[in-house]
Amino acid sequence: MSAELKITLVRSAIGQSEKMKGRLLGMGLTKREKTVTLQDTPEIRGMIAKVAHLVRVEE
């Protein structure tokens, strides 16, 4: 699984739980419309699944 994922924060983390904010920070997403490129790993996929309503993922 050496593919990369482009993850964009499309909704703000305001009003979300601290765990949710921690997951976003763990992926490097700090502001709306910020895009990061991360390796496609099971750990990253798990974080994406927990914050799926806040992010957009491109493979």
Swiss-Prot record:
Coiled-coil intervals, chain numbering: none
One CC-aspect GO term: cytosolic large ribosomal subunit
Pfam families assigned: Ribosomal_L30 (PF00327)
Gene Ontology biological process terms, A to Z: translation
Top-level taxon of the source organism: Bacteria
Keywords: Ribonucleoprotein, Ribosomal protein
Keyword Chaperone tagged: no
MF terms (GO), sorted A to Z: structural constituent of ribosome
CDD domains, alphabetized: Ribosomal_L30
Entry's family note: Belongs to the universal ribosomal protein uL30 family.
Subunit structure: Part of the 50S ribosomal subunit.
Record's protein name: Large ribosomal subunit protein uL30
